[in-house]
Amino acid sequence: MKPFDIKAKRPLIISGPCSAETEEQTLETCRQIAATGLVDVLRAGIWKPRTKPGSFEGVGLKGLAWMSKARELTGLPIGTEVATSKHVEAALEFGVDVIWVGARTTVNPFSVQDIADALKGADVTVLIKNPMNPDIELWSGAIARMQNAGITKLGLIHRGFSAYGASLYRNNPMWHLAIEMRSRFPELPMICDPSHICGCRTYLQEVAQKSADLDYDGLIIESHICPDKAWSDASQQLTPDGLEALLRSIVWRRSTTDSPSYQQALAKLRSQIDQIDAEIFELISKRMRVAEQIGLVKRDNNVTILQGGRWQSIVDRVVSQAPKLGVSTE
């Protein structure tokens, strides 16, 4: 098999079960996924960093042997998550083509450095998932540690961020943070992980399509021959048939086009946006100056800065106006 090149294909699709549970389940899932002809890399969790002890924490080394068999069976590269230097050593011993650092590991610079040190000199693709908490510096720092270790085949995985309170998603995507990472590291492929963003099958297609619309470079999606009986994350995994249907539904658009009519229309609209932005900033500046004057008046009259009634009336007024102007109330 040729050495894996993460930039050789777009979109890059990585799929497989959340966990390698048994040899039969692993091989049959990988066989069916490969048969779709839409997947580029097979994945399976070998070591599972669970939130609470007592949950299934992976089968360990024998799972790597199963994945090696899956590679022989399908001809596809294999990948898995690592969390310690021992995991790295085992993955390299079995010739794993793609490894990734999980969200629970990215938050810890000591763990990331331990992995980076173990990877020195290795010719393997390394993907870095965003940290659990929305701290872009931790994400950037993990990339820097890998680069300092001489790792050149790097990529990013956006899997969403933990958020307190009720949410539509298991992990809030916070798309703006992933977009900021793309600005910082434009040369690195960005892969979306809708399985972990959603936490269920309901919104997988919607999130996957949005990532495609945002010019992501691929997807990593969990698939299992019998998702409802999976030993981990059952609700977010698709059957291989479901995976194929989802992948065929995604529309991957071009980043740009040389069409003269497109370029002219876009230039005209962008000029309008630039003008509107300038007007908005001018109005914001004027508002800030008025707000400063209000603050001085309150100070001179020994009145608190925040007055709840006034603030709520502003919020209510703006929210009520939003639908009339075609703006989301969110």
What feature does the model see in each segment?
Residues 11-28, 52-57, 77-82, 102-104, ...:
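Active-site mouth loops of central-metabolism enzymes
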Residues 56-80, 115-125, 175-190, 236-256, ...:
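Alpha-helix-loop-beta-strand connector modules within alpha/beta enzyme cores
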Residues 6, 111-245, 255-258:
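Catalytic alpha/beta core domains of metabolic enzymes, predominantly
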Residues 255-330:
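Domain-level signature for soluble enzymes in the chorismate/prephenate branch of the shikimate pathway
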Residues 11-17, 40-44, 78-80, 99-101, ...:
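Hydrophobic faces of well-ordered beta-strands that scaffold small-molecule active sites
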Residues 43-61, 225-234, 294-303:
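Glycine-rich, proline-tolerant flexible connector loops at the mouths of alpha/beta enzymes
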Residues 1-14:
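N-terminal amphipathic alpha-helix/helix-capping segment at the start of soluble metabolic enzymes
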Residues 57-59, 75-84, 88, 97-111, ...:
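Catalytic beta/alpha-barrel core
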